[in-house]
Amino acid sequence: MDDNFTLQFSYKGISFQVYVILFGKNSNKQFTDSRSLTRLPFCIPTVCNYPFFAAVLGILETHNCAKEWLISNYLLPWCHKEPCVVPYWVDFRFGEEEKISEWCPLLNIDILSRDFIKKEYGSPIDAFKHFISQNRYAYISYNAYYVDDFWSKGEHRYPYKHQCLVLGYDDKQGHMLIADFFNGIYKTTKISYENFILAYDTYNQTNNIPQKNLTDEANDQSKTEYLNNLETLELEYGHEIKLLSLNQNSPKIDYMLMYGLTQDFINGTDTTIYTEYSINMQDKLSFGFEFFIEIRKYLQKCMAEKTHINLKPFYIIQKFNHVMKIRAEILQINNQHFLAEMDEALKYSSTILYTLMKYNIKKNDIQMKILEKYDSLTTLEFSIVKELSNILEACYLQNPSL
């Protein structure tokens, strides 16, 4: 039975749908949509952020080996200092995708070029069917124009590069099974062989930064160079195919990584994990406690102007606290003050997220109320992470066998 559910409601004659994801009861079974479907096991992950990291966590959770990796990470949120200027502007800190074996030792990665796949297999369909037979998931860039579920009913389509996980196929019905964010919800969907080939072949013939994902500020002349730099990085992304497979390594908690990320959170720095992207954009990003300050500025500005609030950072904050609770349970932390603050932070972050969902519909005046809650939450977050850092240093880092 699927523990996730869809909540439907209406306001002033307009219907809305919210997909609610519950943690902790992912099934390890292979779901069978039809008898002719061949697929790798996969489930909706606890945290649905950027498609690559959602895919990684979904693979680990469906094989029941995710908890150690989950609590070792998801500790350092970051955001662009110019919120919403690009679709990917807020997330948790991870290492480079190409070096996943370093920061997620449970998975192996093989990187193939599209030229190699064309030469070796001819058809991408044949290539991905072969990879699936080897128990390897394929992470690819594709043109979402050809995927129906990516768009709302009646929405104008345009070429748009996105990323998905290829995890199954059905020769009888003639479709591939992929996982991605479809209409704002991370899930699996089917795409016909014909449309899959079109989406695969035209992945880079797209508008890389579509106007619908930008704020008005992004059109200012002062941001032209900034956006051009990001667009150049985006154009270069996606030619390679990443093949992910589970290995035989045992799950382990990385206490040093956790400690380093807590220190970065407290200091608003990025010294534990290095990536080319963060080096190139280091003056444009905020981390940890500074992330919370930056998001407050964004929140206050949106409410003052009564504009739509992007909920991504508040989802990240809510999941930050959700994972913190899991972390406390696995580490068997019994500091009652810490646990009480953690529960309060999770409650605050959930309340803020759901209140802002309603605000985007009603545009009601909640500015003072929400900002007060957000400020209280920020204070709690700093206290919780500082205490976690102290606990890690006192109880775990002193033991070299861990």
Question: What does each model-identified segment do?
Answer:
Residues 17, 163, 188-190:
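Well-ordered beta-strand positions in beta-sheet-rich domains
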Residues 14-19, 23-24, 28-122, 223, ...:
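Cysteine-nucleophile protease catalytic domains, especially the papain-like/related folds used
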Residues 63-89, 120-173, 180, 392:
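Active-site-adjacent substructure of cysteine-protease-like catalytic cores
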Residues 13, 171-315:
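Noncatalytic regulatory segments and standalone regulatory/sensor domains
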Residues 96-145, 234-235, 242-248, 253-260:
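Predominantly the structural core of cysteine protease catalytic domains
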Residues 245-402:
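Charged low-complexity "KEKE/polyampholyte" interaction tracts
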